[in-house]
Regions:
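Noncatalytic alpha-helical scaffold of FAD-dependent oxidoreductases
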Residues: 1-454
Length: 454
C-alpha cells in the first residue's frame, strides 16, 4: 500500500488514503477483506469532480487498466462488448470506431472507465434519445465485501443490478461488464449549429414541441454572464452520426484522437475571472452562425473537445473549481429561468455552462437523469459568496422537484439527497443486503450520509 494524496477532477478537497493497485481479482479480495473502520472504495481515472473516489484515512483500490476482470472483446456481429471495469472509454473507442461501433453513451470526456460509467450511470447529449449508460449494460460481475463475485443483470438479481447502476461504487467493486454498442458508418458527426438570442429561444428550440426529438444528440451552451434581453442566450448544437456518404472520401472510419495542447504547469487563480470569461463568452457566441448551419465534425471535436487539452482542470489555479449540475422537471421552466438569472445577477463567471433536455428515468434508484432540464456549469471554487448562492439555488431546485448529480457534487447538504432521490431508502436496503459489513465507503458517502438510515 502507498499513502497518496487524492482529489476529484475539480481539485478542491484533497485527502490522503492508502492506495493499492491490484494485480488480479484475488488481490482485490485481499484488500477488501482487510478494510478497516474507514472502509474501501474503488477509483478509476479520477474524473468525478468531487470526492466520490476518495476515502480519507481508508483504502482506495486504484482500478484503471485491464489487470482485473475478463479481457476486452467486441463481437462485431452483435455489437456486444465485454470489458474489464478499469478499461477506459478511450481505449474502447480506439478499437471499436474503426470497426463500425460507437459507445451507446459518452459524457464530455472519454477518459472514464467502464466501471465508473456504470457507478455514475453517465449520460450524454443523447439521453432524450438513448437514455443513460446503465440502460445498455447487459450484465456485470461485481465483487461484494464478502469476497464473493456475483453476476448482475436486469434479469438476474435485478434489484442489486439497478442499485449498482448509479450507486457510486458503494455496493461493490465492478470487475467487468457486457454492454451493447451503437453501429456507425463513419467516425464523423453531422452537426447543426445555430445561435439563439435569449433564454426563451433556447428553451423553445429544445422543447418537445420543437424538432429536438429528431436529433440523436442535442446540447446548448449557455452564456451565464449575459443579462437583460440576452440573459440565457446560447449556441445550440445538434447532430447524428454521419453516413459514409456524408463523411466524404478516404477511410471514413479512421479514428485517432489527439491531445493537441497542454495546460501550463502553473496558472494564477484569477486567470479565469469575470472579465476574461465575459470576453470569451462574447467571442464564442459571435462566432456561432446566426442561422442554422450544417457541417461535419470528428467524433473528438463533437463529443470530447476538452480532452484535446491535457490537464485543463488546472486552469482555475490552485483554488480548484466546482462543477454544479442539477435537473428540474420539464414543467419547471420558470425555475430554470430564475436559476440562470440568479447566477447572471451575481456575476458568477462560467465559460462552461450547458443545458440539455433529458428523457425518462431508468429503474436505478440513485441514477441522476430523469425527464427534465439539466444545467451544468463550472465555477472557480473561490468566488466570493458562492456557497450562499448555491444554497439558494439548491432550495429552488429541490422545491421544484429536482435533484443534483452526485458524481459531480462537492457542495449539497445530506437532506438534498433524501429530497431529490425519493427511492433512496430502496437503494439503501439493497446496498445493505450487498454489504452488511458496510465495508464500502468514500468521502462523498460520509459527507452526505449515504450509508445512514433516517
Amino acid at each position: 500500500m502507498t499513502k497518496q494524496r487524492l482529489s476529484g477532477w475539480g481539485r478542491t478537497a484533497w485527502t490522503v488514503a492508502d492506495t493499492v493497485v491490484p494485480a488480479d481479482e484475488n488481490e482485490v479480495r485481499t484488500v477488501v477483506g482487510s478494510a478497516g473502520d474507514r472502509g474501501v472504495i474503488a477509483r478509476g481515472l479520477g474524473r468525478s469532480y468531487g470526492a466520490a473516489a476518495q476515502n480519507a484515512g481508508g483504502q482506495v483500490l486504484m482500478m484503471p487498466g485491464t489487470a482485473v476482470g475478463r479481457p476486452y472483446s467486441l463481437d462485431t456481429s452483435t455489437g456486444i462488448v465485454t470489458a474489464p471495469a478499469g478499461m477506459s472509454l478511450d481505449d474502447v473507442l480506439r478499437d471499436s470506431v474503426p470497426r463500425g461501433w460507437f459507445v451507446p453513451v459518452t459524457p464530455g470526456t472519454r477518459f472514464v472507465t467502464v466501471g465508473g460509467a456504470i457507478a455514475s450511470d453517465i449520460h450524454g447529449k443523447n439521453h432524450h434519445f438513448d437514455g443513460s449508460f446503465g440502460q445498455h449494460v447487459l450484465a456485470m460481475r461485481v465483487m461484494l465485501s464478502s469476497g464473493d463475485v456475483v453476476t448482475l443483470s436486469p434479469q438476474e438479481n435485478p434489484g442489486w443490478f439497478w442499485a449498482t447502476v448509479g450507486g457510486m461504487g458503494l455496493t461493490g467493486v465492478i470487475l467487468d461488464a457486457e454492454f451493447r454498442m451503437l453501429p456507425v458508418e463513419s467516425s464523423r458527426v453531422r452537426v447543426e449549429t445555430e445561435r439563439l438570442s435569449g433564454f426563451d429561444a433556447v428553451v423553445a428550440a429544445m422543447s418537445t414541441d420543437g424538432d429536438d426529438a429528431s436529433y440523436r444528440y442535442s446540447v446548448s451552451w449557455v452564456d451565464l454572464v449575459a443579462t437583460g434581453k440576452s440573459m440565457g442566450r446560447g449556441v445550440l448544437t445538434r447532430g447524428d452520426h454521419a453516413t459514409a456518404a456524408e463523411a466524404g472520401g478516404g477511410d471514413v472510419l479512421a479514428y485517432d484522437p489527439k491531445v493537441r495542447v497542454a495546460a501550463p504547469p502553473w496558472v494564477p487563480n484569477q486567470l479565469l475571472n469575470k472579465l476574461s470569461i465575459k470576453a470569451f463568452n462574447e467571442l464564442w457566441f459571435r462566432k456561432a452562425p446566426a442561422r442554422r448551419h450544417v457541417g461535419i465534425e470528428s467524433i473528438p471535436a463533437f463529443f470530447h473537445p476538452l480532452d484535446g487539452v491535457r490537464g485543463w482542470n488546472t486552469l482555475y489555479g490552485t483554488q480548484g473549481f466546482i462543477q454544479y449540475q442539477f435537473i428540474v422537471p420539464l414543467s419547471q421552466v420558470e425555475v430554470l429561468r430564475k436559476v440562470i438569472e440568479a447566477f447572471a445577477g451575481q456575476g458568477v463567471a462560467s465559460f462552461l455552462a450547458v443545458l440539455k433536455r433529458m428523457g425518462p428515468a431508468n429503474e436505478a434508484p440513485m441514477s441522476f437523469p430523469t425527464e427534465g432540464w439539466t444545467l451544468t456549469l463550472d465555477m472557480a471554487a473561490g468566488i466570493k459568496g458562492l456557497p450562499e448562492l448555491l444554497a439558494r439555488v439548491d432550495t429552488m431546485v429541490l422545491d421544484a422537484g429536482g435533484r443534483h448529480y452526485l458524481a459531480k457534487d462537492s457542495h449539497v447538504a445530506p437532506l438534498a439527497v433524501r429530497r431529490g432521490y425519493p427511492q433512496f431508502g430502496e437503494w439503501l436496503r439493497a446496498r445493505d443486503e450487498m454489504d452488511p459489513a458496510r465495508a464500502w465507503n468514500s468521502d462523498l458517502a460520509r459527507r452526505l450520509g449515504l450509508l445512514e438510515r433516517g
